[in-house]
C-alpha cells in the first residue's frame, strides 16, 4: 500500500498559511496533496466535507479531487466557517490516494505553545 509523506503543522498562529505554502510547493512538484485537520480549521470554498450518512460518496469525491492534484477535506463543524477532523474510517481510505498529507494538528488558540500535562503522558 502506498504511504504518503505526512507533515503535521502545529503552533499558535500561521498554521493555515504555512500549510498553503507547503501545498503550493508540493503541487509544483506534481504531488497529490491532501489537507486535513485534527482539530478545527477555517472552512475554505472548495473543501469537501465528509457526509456522515454517505461516507463512500465522500471518499469518492475526495479521491476525485486528489486525482486533480489537491483536496482539502474535513467534517462538518458546529462552529461557523470551520471544519473538523475526518472520521478514522474516511481517513484510512483517503490517505493512500495522496502523495503528501498536510495536517493542521493542534488547537493552541491564543497561547504561544502547548505541552503535555502530567495526566497526558
Residue ranges and their predicted role:
Residues 1-2, 27, 63-66, 93-96:
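Solvent-exposed alpha-helices and their adjacent loops that cap or buttress functional pockets
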Residues 2-26:
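Walker A (P-loop) phosphate-binding motif
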Residues 14-15, 39-43, 78:
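Short active-site-proximal "capping" loops at secondary-structure junctions
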Residues 18-20, 110-113:
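Short glycine/serine/threonine-rich phosphate/pyrophosphate-binding segments
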Residues 24-72:
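N-terminal phosphate/diphosphate-binding loop that engages ATP/GTP or pyrophosphate donors
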Residues 78-112:
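Phosphate-binding/switch loop-helix module in NTP-utilizing enzymes
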Residues 114-121:
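Conserved small/polar residues in nucleotide/adenosyl-binding loops
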Amino acid at each position: 500500500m502506498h504511504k504518503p509523506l505526512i507533515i503535521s503543522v502545529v503552533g499558535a498562529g500561521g498554521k493555515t498559511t504555512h500549510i498553503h505554502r507547503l501545498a503550493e510547493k508540493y503541487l509544483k512538484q506534481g504531488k497529490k496533496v491532501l489537507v486535513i485537520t485534527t482539530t478545527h480549521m477555517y472552512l475554505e470554498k472548495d473543501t469537501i466535507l465528509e457526509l456522515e450518512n454517505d461516507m463512500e460518496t465522500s471518499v469518492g469525491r475526495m479521491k476525485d479531487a486528489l486525482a486533480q492534484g489537491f483536496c482539502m477535506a474535513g467534517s462538518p463543524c458546529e462552529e461557523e466557517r470551520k471544519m473538523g477532523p475526518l472520521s478514522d474510517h474516511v481517513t484510512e481510505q483517503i490517505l493512500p490516494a495522496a502523495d503528501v498529507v498536510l495536517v493542521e494538528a493542534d488547537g493552541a488558540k491564543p497561547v504561544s505553545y502547548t505541552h503535555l500535562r502530567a495526566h497526558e503522558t
